[in-house]
Amino acid sequence: MYSSVVHLARANPFNAPHLQLVHDGLAGPRSDPAGPPGPPRRSRNLAAAAVEEQYSCDYGSGRFFILCGLGGIISCGTTHTALVPLDLVKCRMQVDPQKYKSIFNGFSVTLKEDGFRGLAKGWAPTFIGYSLQGLCKFGFYEVFKVLYSNMLGEENAYLWRTSLYLAASASAEFFADIALAPMEAAKVRIQTQPGYANTLRDAAPKMYKEEGLKAFYKGVAPLWMRQIPYTMMKFACFERTVEALYKFVVPKPRSECSKPEQLVVTFVAGYIAGVFCAIVSHPADSVVSVLNKEKGSSASEVLKRLGFRGVWKGLFARIIMIGTLTALQWFIYDSVKVYFRLPRPPPPEMPESLKKKLGYTQ
């Protein structure tokens, strides 16, 4: 199974052309069938490591942050748009559980009433909103991670790395949600209010006419409640899971793994992180869905009305959606980094100075 997943990773569209050279002969000259044999080829892993050192920019440079933001646009915009049908059913289960009783029932009712085109409702605000969110989420995460690491210093950055991941991701998501909120509000109106509007072009002017700018940003606080814990879990859990996989599961160091093998680890760690993300952020997601559907309601009123059981409606659908979503996002984001030859630091190791202080080395 592992080899088959590696094969899929090799075939991913973001596989960098320079990596293929390793397999095609960069690792060592091939022997000419008509001439004397050439020198033995170096191992593929060592050659891959040599290529890996040829980065297109410095870690923490402006170009690095811009390309990370581009990776966020591609990873978030495409994946969220691809899962619009599941997201639509999930939202309808949250706002009208009597009508949409389960995932399968929700799909059945939607297909019966709206046809296959109905499953794509809200794709435009989803694509625009989550592309903007991905730009800020991944781009600013890298910015804040470097900023906070420099503030802490090498030793403290290692000792407090989980807190560093949590702080950097929370800071990034704060700004990402401001970019997402208007499109998220329009998406929920389109998906959950029959007859309100079928397109973003129809929904946005109507929302502004009815409630002004408040219509687009009244859900930003619940969005922070949903997305900041989600993103903190997404990044911190992913970073520590990658670290654990290389330490306890993968049978060789990361430096000896090929790029496709590293991307498989990325995908697995992303899915594990996604499951926890869905659970942590689901209650706030339910509040956001109901709040954006109704006029004049507040987050506290919606939360009180839904109750403990109500806020967990649609959790199974969201676990499937967010698990798949998070895994694909990390896979695509890491693939973009590989394609543009961006620095991809290995899992953190204890600094030598700290090892000496703790008596691990002489």
UniProtKB/Swiss-Prot annotation:
Top-rank taxon: Eukaryota
Primary residence: mitochondrion
Solcar repeat placement: 63-147, 160-244, 261-339
Membrane-related topology note: Multi-pass membrane protein
Compartments where found: Mitochondrion inner membrane
Mitochondrial intermembrane side stretches: 50-63, 142-161, 239-261, 334-362
Keyword Nucleotide-binding belongs to the record: no
Residue numbers bearing the Phosphotyrosine modification: Y196
Modified residues (N6-acetyllysine): K99, K209
Keyword Transmembrane helix among UniProt keywords: yes
Keywords from the UniProt entry: Acetylation, Membrane, Methylation, Mitochondrion, Mitochondrion inner membrane, Phosphoprotein, Repeat, Symport, Transit peptide, Transmembrane, Transmembrane helix, Transport
Transit peptide: 1-49
BP terms from Gene Ontology: mitochondrial phosphate ion transmembrane transport; phosphate ion transmembrane transport
Topological domain spans for side Mitochondrial matrix: 87-121, 184-218, 285-314
GO molecular-function terms, A-Z: phosphate transmembrane transporter activity; phosphate:proton symporter activity; protein-containing complex binding; symporter activity
Segments traversing the membrane: 64-86, 122-141, 162-183, 219-238, 262-284, 315-333
Residues modified as N6-methyllysine: K112
Cellular component terms per the entry's GO annotation: mitochondrial inner membrane; mitochondrion
Function, in words: Inorganic ion transporter that transports phosphate or copper ions across the mitochondrial inner membrane into the matrix compartment. Mediates proton-coupled symport of phosphate ions necessary for mitochondrial oxidative phosphorylation of ADP to ATP. Transports copper ions probably in the form of anionic copper(I) complexes to maintain mitochondrial matrix copper pool and to supply copper for cytochrome C oxidase complex assembly. May also play a role in regulation of the mitochondrial permeability transition pore (mPTP).
Protein family: Belongs to the mitochondrial carrier (TC 2.A.29) family.
Subunit structure: Interacts with PPIF; the interaction is impaired by CsA.
PANTHER family in alphabetical order: SOLUTE CARRIER FAMILY 25 (MITOCHONDRIAL CARRIER PHOSPHATE CARRIER), MEMBER 3, LIKE-RELATED-RELATED (PTHR45671), SOLUTE CARRIER FAMILY 25 MEMBER 3 (PTHR45671:SF2)
Protein name per its UniProtKB record: Solute carrier family 25 member 3
Source species: Bos taurus (Bovine)
Native organism taxonomy: Eukaryota, Metazoa, Chordata, Craniata, Vertebrata
Gene name, Swiss-Prot/TrEMBL: SLC25A3
